[in-house]
């Protein structure tokens, strides 16, 4: 059993006590699916940490975006300084997958920019799982994508011990086999250098180098060294060097795979010829032969992942190995944070990936086996994660139906109440809100404003700047590292308020915010539904003066339901405060960078969206109706994933086409 040692100046209080006990007890009784309904500011992260210490299993915490994953990673590093807390997200700063657009006969080559720091953290995560069981990995949905086989990875590990009989050339060959490159000049991660009878290697997953000193054919000394100065940090008796990459394949496997790939290519070529598709037949033959030549000469080729089924010896349709396979015995605890957003995201990955690759296969750009280079589908994911804790302030019916037990965490240890919710008419809403903002500025508090359209956000920001407010507008063209810096500057007082379309950002901790203003709150739709309203109102729940103003001319069902739920939570907290003699206090929290700068964030999403927008043109779709339908499909897809800012961009593009009945 994993031994986790939690360090915190706080003790469980309020609903945390019962929630922790009930969740741990339920898992102990053999229940596998549990939901924690925890309001904003109730200390859900603390509860998660306590549950981990009691369940005593390696843990995977799944978050729906890199920003929140990074925030959780930092918090769990503080909770568990003596345990292995790791970070596993996509290592692409920018990623454009290969694709084919039949309507314009356009083939888009794969283009990407890889983040070396995140690659190192990913490798460190898997090496920790293979070395120890007291491991907590905070991950994005990247954990369901294909990764090298853990068996191949483990079988390729190089273990060295002082006194071992092994010659220098043997060690060099072993390092080359596990994807390290010899470079006697550049001693950086993934490289090794040789100086006489001394070999120094820079593992891809750690900060220190390793020095191997030989005396003839015997290892005379092992030590960790500073890669810059070469100074010895600590002497070692033994070292374990893990591969530089997750995908490791032996020579015999590559030869076997090449035979199978050629057989599949011949069958696919014959299929195309029978269909009268001579261009596709020629294309698949030439592209595959080129890749095979590259693979034979260099050991790799562009898009090698598309041949992963053959290279790993999997059967047709068999799922790929992924991070979940690296957990020992596949016996671990899964915590899905903000489950109402994360679960739909997991479910959508497989379908989106398959749709793109199916087109590549149909037009001869890829073999059918490329379809097996994919993320897990939802059924496979569920089968691999039996012990699951869903965590959300607004869980979806999906996770509630699956759960064998549901526990609430309504009471906040700080005594803070849910924000007061007030509905005001939209008439003169801009001036009314300006007065409210000035009141908050006088109290050194901050404000969040959410609008329905990009144009309204821009106009509102310009107007408030003219009247002297320190205001920032968060929009999709701001990369996420800059976005997190704007949020930090809001906390520091550089800005008085922030305007945006989607300021949900579940889990973001901004205790200085005492007012959330929701403009056009009665425009029922994906930006103003019950869950969106509850989550947005919750942004003011960490401040003792928390208040939400909904500007609306009518009471929608979503507004009524959100106000009713907020009032229910307020009454529960008030009763607890009165019983325990608690005076509510604003959460006091140090101002950190939410995301370390070296951890590049979700630029890839923003860039991908720009590329999508370029794709949706009248020239391509011929008629406004066809373009409108395509835009609507994308809008609804993003809305279903609660990615409202992107959904709103597609909606705005629809509106720009001219009058039509558009559902928001």
Swiss-Prot record:
- Domain Helicase ATP-binding, chain residue ranges per copy: 25-182
Q: Which GO terms fall under molecular function for this chain's record? A: ATP binding; ATP hydrolysis activity; DNA binding; excinuclease ABC activity; helicase activity
Q: Name one GO cellular component term.
A: cytoplasm
Q: Tell me which Gene Ontology terms the entry assigns under biological process.
A: nucleotide-excision repair; SOS response
Q: Which CDD domains match?
A: DEXHc_UvrB, SF2_C_UvrB
Annotated signal sequence is: none
What are the UniProt keywords, alphabetically?
ATP-binding, Cytoplasm, DNA damage, DNA excision, DNA repair, Excision nuclease, Helicase, Hydrolase, Nucleotide-binding, SOS response
> What assembly does the database describe for this protein?
Forms a heterotetramer with UvrA during the search for lesions. Interacts with UvrC in an incision complex.
Name of the featured protein? UvrABC system protein B
Gene that produces this protein = uvrB
């Amino acid at each position: 059993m994993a031994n986790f040692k939690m360090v915190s100046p706080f003790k469980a209080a309020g609903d945390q006590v019962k929630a922790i006990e009930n969740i741990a007890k339920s898992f102990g009784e053999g229940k596998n699916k549990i939901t924690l309904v925890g309001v904003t500011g109730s200390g859900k992260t603390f509860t998660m940490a306590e549950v981990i210490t009691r369940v005593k299993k390696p843990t995977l915490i799944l978050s729906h975006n890199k920003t929140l994953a990074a925030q959780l990673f930092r918090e769990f590093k503080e909770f568990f300084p003596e345990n292995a807390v790791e970070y596993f997200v996509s290592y692409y700063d920018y990623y454009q997958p290969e694709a084919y657009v039949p309507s314009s006969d356009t083939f888009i080559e794969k283009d990407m920019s890889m983040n070396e720091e995140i690659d190192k953290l990913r490798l460190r995560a898997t090496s920790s799982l293979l070395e120890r069981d007291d491991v907590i990995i905070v991950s994005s949905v990247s954990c369901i994508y294909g990764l090298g086989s853990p068996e191949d990875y483990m079988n390729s590990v190089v273990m060295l011990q002082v006194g071992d009989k092994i010659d220098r050339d043997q060690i060099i060959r072993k390092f080359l086999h596990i994807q390290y490159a010899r470079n006697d000049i550049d001693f950086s991660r993934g490289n090794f250098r040789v100086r006489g009878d001394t070999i120094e290697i820079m593992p891809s997953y750690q900060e220190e180098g390793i020095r191997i000193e030989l005396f003839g054919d015997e290892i005379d000394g092992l030590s960790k060294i500073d890669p810059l100065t070469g100074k010895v940090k600590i002497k070692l008796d033994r070292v374990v060097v893990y591969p530089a990459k997750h995908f490791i394949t032996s020579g015999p496997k590559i030869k076997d795979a090449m035979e199978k790939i050629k057989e599949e290519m011949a069958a696919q070529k014959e299929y195309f010829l029978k269909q009268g598709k001579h261009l596709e037949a020629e294309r698949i033959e030439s592209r595959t032969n080129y890749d095979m030549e590259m693979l034979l000469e260099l050991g790799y080729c562009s898009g090698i992942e598309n041949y992963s089924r053959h290279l790993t010896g999997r059967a047709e349709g068999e799922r790929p190995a992924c991070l979940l396979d690296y957990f020992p015995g596949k016996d671990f605890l899964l915590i899905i944070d903000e489950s109402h957003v994360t679960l739909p995201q997991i479910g959508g990955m497989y379908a989106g990936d398959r749709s793109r690759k199916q087109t590549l296969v149909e037009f001869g750009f890829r073999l059918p086996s490329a379809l097996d280079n994919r993320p897990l589908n939802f059924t496979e994911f569920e089968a691999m994660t039996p012990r699951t804790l869903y965590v959300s302030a607004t869980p979806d019916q999906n996770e509630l139906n699956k759960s064998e037990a549901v526990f609430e965490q309504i009471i906040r240890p700080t005594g803070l109440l849910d924000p007061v919710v007030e509905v005001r008419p939209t008439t003169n809403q801009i001036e009314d809100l300006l007065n409210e903002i000035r009141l908050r500025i006088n109290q050194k508090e901050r404000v969040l404003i959410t609008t329905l359209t990009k144009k309204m956000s821009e106009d509102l920001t310009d107007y408030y700047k003219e009247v002297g407010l320190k205001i920032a507008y968060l929009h999709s063209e701001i990369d996420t590292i800059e976005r997190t810096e704007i949020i930090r500057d809001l906390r520091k007082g550089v800005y008085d308020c922030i305007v945006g379309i989607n300021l949900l950002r579940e889990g973001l901790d901004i205790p200085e915010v005492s007012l959330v203003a929701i403009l056009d709150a009665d425009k029922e739709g994906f930006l103003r539904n019950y869950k969106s309203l509850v989550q947005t109102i919750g942004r003011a729940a960490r401040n003792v003066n928390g208040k939400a103003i909904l500007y609306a001319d009518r009471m929608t069902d979503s507004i009524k339901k959100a106000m009713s739920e907020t009032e229910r939570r307020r009454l529960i907290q008030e009763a607890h405060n009165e019983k325990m003699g608690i005076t509510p206090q604003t959460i006091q929290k140090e101002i950190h960078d939410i995301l370390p700068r070296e951890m590049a964030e979700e630029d890839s999403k923003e860039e991908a969206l720009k590329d999508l927008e370029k794709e949706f043109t009248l020239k391509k779709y011929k008629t406004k109706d066809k373009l409108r339908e395509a835009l609507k499909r994308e809008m609804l897809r993003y809305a279903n994933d609660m990615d409202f800012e992107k959904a709103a961009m597609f909606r705005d593009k629809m509106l720009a086409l001219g009058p039509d009945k558009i559902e928001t």
